[in-house]
Amino acid sequence: MPAPRIIITGKPRSGKSTLALSLMTELRLKGKWVSGILTPEIIKKKERTGFRIIDIASDETKVLASVDGKGPSVGKYHVDLQELDYITQKFMDHVESADVIIIDEIGKMEMLSEKFRNMAEKIFTIEKPVIAVVNMEMMKQYSGTGDVFTIDEKSNIEKITEKILKDMKMDD
C-alpha cells in the first residue's frame, strides 16, 4: 500500500497553514517524527510584512520573504532565495529519518528556487506519508498526487485534522 499523500489547498488566509500546524502538533503527540518546512506569516502592527521559513526538525528559522527585502518579487514581497535554499537543503538532509513529511507551502515564492522545485518533486516519490499545502494556482500540477482537501475560512480545522489523521491511519 503506497504511503498516504494529502494535499491541502484553499484561498489565501483560509487556514491552510493553521491546518498544517494542527496536523504537525497531533502527529508529534502520537510520537511521530515530523520533518518538513513551514512558512508562517510575519505580522507587524497588524499588517503582514512577510513570511518566515522554518525547518520543522531543527526549528531553525530564516526570513523567506519580506516587503523590505531583496530578491525576486512576488506581489509586494521580495523572496530571499539564499535562505529558502538553505532551509530546503537542511530539510532534505534529514528527510529519510522522518515518519511524516509536511510542506507548507508549495507556492509561487517557494517555486522561484530550483532547489525547492526539485525537493517538491522528490517528496512525492519517496515512500513516506506527505502532507503538502499547495497554492490554488499550482493545483493543476499536483492534483493527481494525493487526496485533496480544499478549505476555506469556515472550515473546522479540528474536524479536518481528525479526518486527515483517520485517512492516513494515524488516528490511534
Which residues does each predicted region cover?
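Hydrophobic anchor at the beta1->P-loop junction of P-loop NTPases
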Residues: 8
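Hydrophobic positions on the alpha1 helix immediately C-terminal to the Walker A/P-loop
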Residues: 19, 23
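Phosphate-binding P-loop
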Residues: 1-3
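N-terminal phosphate/diphosphate-binding loop that engages ATP/GTP or pyrophosphate donors
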Residues: 25-76
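Conserved glycine(s) of the Walker
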Residues: 15
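Internal catalytic-core helix/loop-beta-alpha segment
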Residues: 72-106, 110
